[in-house]
Amino acid sequence: MSLEPFQKSSALSLGVELEMQLVNTHDYDLAPYAEDMLRLMSKIALPGAVVPEMTSSMIEVSTGICHSSAEVLGQLTQIRDALVKSADKLNIAVVGGGTHPFQQWHERRIYDKPRFRELSELYGYLSKQFTIFGQHVHIGCPDADTALLTLHRMSRYIPHFIALSASSPYVQGQDTAFDSARLNSVFAFPLSGRAPFALTWDEFTVYFNKMAHTGVVKSMKDFYWDIRPKPEFGTIEIRVFDTPLTIERATALAGYVQSLGSWFMNDQPFMPTEDDYLVYTYNRFQACRFGLDAVYVDPATGGHMPLREHILMTMAQIERHAHRLDASASIHLLRTSVERNDNDARWLRERQGEERLLAEVIRQAADRFRGGVDHEPGGFS
């Protein structure tokens, strides 16, 4: 199969996908209600789409094409309210977070869809372990070469995205000591990691054709890269975010991506090189393990600095772009989070420290998702 042409899209347009947990309301374990939720959600007029995911205790929701973080928040609010309404009818709850803290992977059921059955046959138990929950952010690019240049510039900021969204400290009932343990499950797949270093669509097409010739891949869907081009949408898709506990944080992350994209496309602050990736996996590990307390190694200088300082420095650099895009509320929410050393992983650990019962933590997280408790500090009102 040949690589499809890169479609035109509006530069800096946004699309957000969220993979959500479905839990019962008696012990707050995962519950196989995807089909029922899809049936109920199909009766509600909504932007974007609601689709099944790999296992039957999760669904994916997405916005339509948006042009501002305010528009993202408006659409996610409609979708969130519909999710809550549908879940209430089924006596279940919808929860954010990158992992379910105590679910047992072997109890999961693969959703009955040909592609999911095919992946289950190929990847075995990894498919059930892939009951993890991420946020994907699409950003529109005016042409294919700009998309690749933006992709490789954005790769320097992967640790930012991981630390700011981290919400998966618990796996199988244990504190993993990682802020984002979810990504450890992604790394097990053979076509995960980072995209090849190609700065023109012609170069990328050569790479894709070579891979297709081997029979290893058939389409871009077969790549599980941290950032990948989506030629059918005219976007690049950033895939390292854990699903946040609130739609406000999900929106803020999209606003941050859009502001970075504006900085890259308008100011051309640096030219990416292959050597940027010498410290890529180290920086990614640091962010997964330590979150906002990570060390960041600057790919250009080799200098070490606290990741939180690099995030705050970057936010200052892109402030005027955020203002122009009406994304200042997004930056403010995330800046406040960094200054308070407060991400969703910390929130989950603090709740567990108080409650000593992960089921109660999930109950509170479900309430937080529906807007019931503990709103995000700063940012959106």
Curated annotation (Swiss-Prot):
Under what name is this protein listed? Answer: Putative glutamate--cysteine ligase 2
GO BP terms, alphabetized:
modified amino acid biosynthetic process
PANTHER family for this protein: GLUTAMATE--CYSTEINE LIGASE 2-RELATED
Q: Note whether Ion transport occurs among the keywords.
A: no
Which keywords describe this protein according to UniProt? Answer: ATP-binding, Ligase, Nucleotide-binding
Its biological function? ATP-dependent carboxylate-amine ligase which exhibits weak glutamate--cysteine ligase activity.
Known catalytic reactions:
L-cysteine + L-glutamate + ATP = gamma-L-glutamyl-L-cysteine + ADP + phosphate + H(+)
The record ties this protein, via Pfam families, to: GCS2 (PF04107)
Write down the top EC class of this protein. Answer: ligase
The coiled-coil regions, if any, are none
Q: Which InterPro entries match?
A: GCL_type2/YbdK_subfam (IPR050141), GCS2 (IPR006336), Gln_synth/guanido_kin_cat_dom (IPR014746), YbdK (IPR011793)
State the organism named in the record: Polaromonas naphthalenivorans (strain CJ2)
Which Enzyme Commission numbers does its entry carry? 6.3.2.2
Supply one GO molecular-function term: glutamate-cysteine ligase activity
